Structures are given as structure tokens and as C-alpha cells.
Amino acid sequence: MDDYRYRDNYEGYAPNDGYYRGNEQNPEEDAQSDVTEGHDEEDEIYEGEYQGIPHPDDVKSKQTKMAPSRADGLRGQADLMAERMEDEEQLAHQYETIIDECGHGRFQWTLFFVLVLALMADGVEVFVVSFALPSAEKDMCLSSSKKGMLGLIVYLGMMAGAFILGGLADKLGRKKVLSMSLAINASFASLSSFVQGYGAFLFCRLISGIGIGGSLPIVFAYFSEFLSREKRGEHLSWLGIFWMTGGIYASAMAWSIIPHYGWGFSMGTNYHFHSWRVFVIVCALPATVSMVALKFMPESPRFLLEMGKHDEAWMILKQVHDTNMRAKGTPEKVFTVSHIKTPKQMDEFIEIQSSTGTWYQRWLVRFMTIFKQVWDNALYCVMGPYRMNTLILAVVWFTMALSYYGLTVWFPDMIRYFQDEEYKSKMKVFFGEHVHGATINFTMENQIHQHGKLVNDKFIKMYFKHVLFEDTFFDKCYFEDVTSTDTYFKNCTIESTTFYNTDLYKHKFIDCRFINSTFLEQKEGCHMDFEEDNDFLIYLVSFLGSLSVLPGNIISALLMDRIGRLKMIGGSMLISAVCCFFLFFGNSESAMIGWQCLFCGTSIAAWNALDVITVELYPTNQRATAFGILNGLCKLGAILGNTIFASFVGITKVVPILLAAASLVGGGLVALRLPETREQVLM
């Protein structure tokens, strides 16, 4: 078998002229253009002359002459790297000029609306599990630990997806990897609505999280490469609005769908498709629509130029120019660019010997090659010349996520705590009551019965909710068709009593004494108690929290290019830290909702500025990788914030408030050490 030579995403180049050499073995592909239309065969001129692209035959002859020089290795790796860096700097300035010529118009806005759906999918993913859990826990009989793992697994998936898919986007392309991310998210999110078991549901949400975790880094890197310097800060901030729109969408859909228990069906006794599963499918729609729409958008020309694909990049830039000019009513305006500088390509050859003949062995070599390149690229971001910027950004991303996600979980938990305290304050206590021969068929709620005596009483088709019988004597009583939530019998004596078709299981009797009592045909299903939360309030709190960021988003978008990224980050984080101290006065549900809206509204500007400066600080071949690393650290901060802040609910408000404020102040001050990128071209 002939040896197989693999070059990872790179093509040969001619060092003397800097043009991209496409796949020279297929000249017909290079020769397709509308420019040559109408020529006779004898007079036909190669289309590349109009674009500044050499004829493939000339390229072949030059490469044949140069082959010995490359084989001899006259220029070392360091020389090639130096030339490449010089080429990249020239390309950055030329590309900025080209984007200015292309203008900002219909093409960018079309791409904008495609990408906002991808960002919405990311925002939805944060909320979908928390909204579905109150209903899903009953179907799947989830304990507190299982519910906690379900919330954690989504963030772990998003963290892994940001690392892996962000790195792949710098090697395989923005569009390709973003499509892959959205496909993974949409397919596994939809699949999770159909699976019945907890393990399968957990796995689907993990893979769905991996898919959506890669979207955020790629979306910002992709869109930034179609924007000019004057438009970049503002329009990336407009893009950031739609992350929070995902929260609004999820809240509205949960409010509209989940309470409708009839929106479902059953197949036999083992398969149930309830309304919360419909909600999960609806939440996968933004990713699905974005994935389909993305098929009609081109790859980033800046990425293609980085890969040395000059002609493909030129055609896309011409498409951007022509689309915008037609929309402005000047279709006659000609795209004047004929030649774009492309960086020297650092070829990597992987030789596969004839013994490596099976498809999976070749696939494994390709996989290991790409993995090594992604890993090396990530190390370059962390340990190369950008290490100080990466370290500072890591601190800012982490502290921002720790405080923001920690508080956004703490707010609804505190609201539930206030609800529980108010509920307990209305508890009725009955002491020493004696009831004989009564038939009870109504709901008993929020009561404590102590040292009572119930003789020959019947409890028929009734519901116990938050009821405690303590040191109570039951004699010749009868319980039938009884359901209960958070109801217990403690230190009771139960004599000659029958329990028929009830959910009063063994664990609900604590240190009780049974004498000649029987349990007949107990209710089947889950033996756990589940709280009936005020779903309306939960959805309303999330809806208002997401809606409150809209003013902050608009202000940050309008001021991003005027005051700069650093002032926006530092100012927003410091103001948010001050807002944290107002939480000491949040002693009611309404006050806590109000302070939540204020905090979210002031902190969003820092998030937008972080997205913009992260995109601008790194070159094209590290942009998505660095963004993915930092976004992965953000999800780690979110996990720690959720865990730490939730543990202090009902214990103290001091620790969460001081921790959030200190994190925001520290991160805001550290951010001021970053370089300002407002006037910087995109490298």
C-alpha cells in the first residue's frame, strides 16, 4: 500500500509571493468564476488574473523548483515563525481596511440573527433543568443528591464543551465546529425529553451541555471577524443581550407549558410523557433553528486567511461587500481588493506507514494529530506571550462567575426560605385533643398534633400536608385512600388500626409502636415526598431577573466604544459590589426580587465588556481557544458559587454578601491591569 501523507489543515505555500495555493491537483475547481463568463474558449483568460491569484500551472512549476529547497530545510522553524508573525501583523491591518470597504449592513445583521439563536440556546440551558426539576423529580423519583447532580452535570458539560470545542474551532473552522456544537445540543436535549430513567437523562443532559458549552466562545469569535474596529464593541454587546433572552424564553415557556399537566400522554404503565418533557423539547428549538440557518452562512474569512486559503476568503469577502452594497442601493460599487496577504504556513507532516492500512488507524492518527495541535494551542495561550493577559482574564472571569452565579442561585433560595418561614409561622398546634368516632375526609395542612387520642376514627380520601402526629395514641382507626406530603408519626402508639391504599410508608413512622395493625395494598410508585413549589413565583423571579439586564445591556452597548472596555469592566464590577450590600436590607420576598433585578442590571455591563476584550486580546489562531478556556473557568466558578452560596441559605446572609462583594471588587481592580483594546485591530 502506498504511504499516506497527512497535513493537518495546511497547504503548501510559495515563500516569495505569499499567495495561497489551493488544491493544485484540481485546476478546474480554481477556475470557476463569473468573471470569465462570455469568453470564447480560444480567448479564455484564467480567472485568477482578476483576483490576483496565480494560475495553477504556474504554481506547480514554482513548487517543483522549490521542492529541493524545502527538502533541504534552508529556513529553520524559527525563521518561518518570524515571517509568519510579520505576515499576521500585515494581514491584520489589511483585513481591517477590507472590512471597512465591505461595510456594515445586511450581511452582518443576517449573521447576527443566526448567532443570537445560538446564544439563546446557551442561556436556555442554564434554566431548563431548574425549571423542569419540580415536575421531573416526581416522574423519576429523584432524591436531593440526584437533583444536585443533575444541576451540576450541566455545568460540567458546558465546561468541557468550552475547552474542547473552543479549541477545535481554531483548527477546523468557526462554522463547522459551531454547527457541530448546536447539533449535539439540539439532538441530546431533545432525546433527554423522551428517556425515562435517571441515568439516561443525566447522560443526555451532560452531552447536551458539552454541545452548548462550545457555542459561546465560537459565536463571539465568529461574529467579531466580520466587524470593523469602530463597530466591534457595540455590536458584540448587542449580541450579548440575547444570552439573557434565553432566560426570558425559558421562563415564559415554563410558565406556559409545565402547569398544563394534560399536555402529555402515556403508553402503558411504564412510559409517561408529561408537560415538563414538552417544555424540554421546546427549549431545544433555538439550537435547532440556529443550526439550520447556519448552513446558509459562510466560514469566517479571517480564519480562512489564517489557514492560507486565500481564494475562499476572497470570495466570501466579496460576498459580504456585494450583499451590503446591494442593500444600500449601490450594487454597481466594485470590490477593489485583488490580493490579500496570507501568513506563511507551518506545515506538519504525519507519515502513515503501509502497515497502517485500516480506516480506524488512519482516523486515530488524524484524531491524535488534531488533539495535539489543540493542546499545544491551549498551552500557548496559557504559557506563551499571552500568559499574563490570560492569567488576569482568568481571575476576572472566575470572580465574576463566582459572585454572579452564586447570587442568582441564592436569590430564589432565599425567596423560598422566606416563604417557608412565613408558612411555618402560620402552623396550628393541637395539644391533648380527643377525637372519637369521627370521619375525616378533608385536607389537613400545616398542623402539629401532640399528646392526642384518636379512637375509632376514619380517615377517608384525604390529604395530609406538613402534618406531624407526636406522642399520639391511635386505637381502632381506619385509613383509606390517603396521600401525604411531609407528614410523619413520631413516638406514637398505633393499635388495631388498618391502613388501606395509602402512601404512609414505613419511613414516615419514627419510633412508633404498632399493636395488631395492618397495612393493605399500599400505593405504588416513589416513596419520597416532593414539595409543591409556587411555580408561578419561581418563573416570575427568573423572568424579572433576565428582563432586568436589558437596560444595562443597552447602556453598555452604546458606551462600549466610547469609554473603553476596561472602564466598563471595572466600573460595572465595583457598582455591582456596592449593590451587594443592599442585600442586608432584603428581608422579604419583594425586597429580594428588587435587589436581584438591580444586581443583574448593573453586572451585565461587565459581562459584555469581558466578552469583547477576550475576543480582541488574542490572535485569530488562538481566539476561540482562549475564550473557551476562560469560559470553562467561568463555569467552574459557577459550580463553586452555587455550592457555597446555597449552603448558607437560612443560616446567615453575611458570608454570601461579603464573598460576592469581595470577589467583584478584587476582580474589578485586577481587570484594570489589562491593556485597552478599543483602538486595536483584530490580530
UniProtKB/Swiss-Prot annotation:
Topology in the lipid bilayer: Multi-pass membrane protein
Induction summary: By amyloid beta peptide.
Residue numbers bearing the Phosphoserine modification: 33
Transmembrane segments: 111-131, 149-169, 183-203, 206-226, 238-258, 278-298, 391-411, 536-556, 566-586, 593-613, 627-649, 654-672
Subcellular location(s) per record: Cytoplasmic vesicle, Secretory vesicle, Synaptic vesicle membrane; Cytoplasmic vesicle, Secretory vesicle, Acrosome
PTM comment: N-glycosylated.
Annotated protein name in UniProt: Synaptic vesicle glycoprotein 2B
Comp. bias (Basic and acidic residues): 1-10
Modified residues (Phosphotyrosine): 423
Source organism of the structure: Rattus norvegicus
GO biological process, one term: regulation of presynaptic cytosolic calcium ion concentration
Residue ranges annotated as Cytoplasmic topological domain: 1-110, 170-182, 227-237, 299-390, 557-565, 614-626, 673-683
Positions on the Extracellular side per record topology: 132-148, 204-205, 259-277, 412-535, 587-592, 650-653
Any one GO molecular function term: transmembrane transporter activity
Lineage: Eukaryota, Metazoa, Chordata, Craniata, Vertebrata
Residues that carry a glycan: 441, 491, 516
Assembly: Interacts with SYT1 in a calcium-independent manner. Forms a complex with SYT1, syntaxin-1 and SNAP25.
Modified residues (Phosphothreonine): 36
One Pfam family in the UniProt entry: Sugar_tr
Database matches in InterPro entries: LD_SV2, MFS, MFS_dom, MFS_sugar_transport-like, MFS_trans_sf, Sugar_transporter_CS, SV2
Annotated function: Probably plays a role in the control of regulated secretion in neural and endocrine cells. (Microbial infection) Receptor for C.botulinum neurotoxin type A (BoNT/A, botA); the toxin binds via extracellular loop 4. Restores uptake of BoNT/A in mouse and rat cells that are deleted for SV2 receptor. Glycosylation of SV2B is not essential for receptor activity, but enhances the interaction. Also serves as a receptor for the closely related C.botulinum neurotoxin type A2; glycosylation is not essential but enhances the interaction.
Sorted UniProt keywords: Cytoplasmic vesicle, Glycoprotein, Membrane, Neurotransmitter transport, Phosphoprotein, Receptor, Synapse, Transmembrane, Transmembrane helix, Transport
Family: Belongs to the major facilitator superfamily.
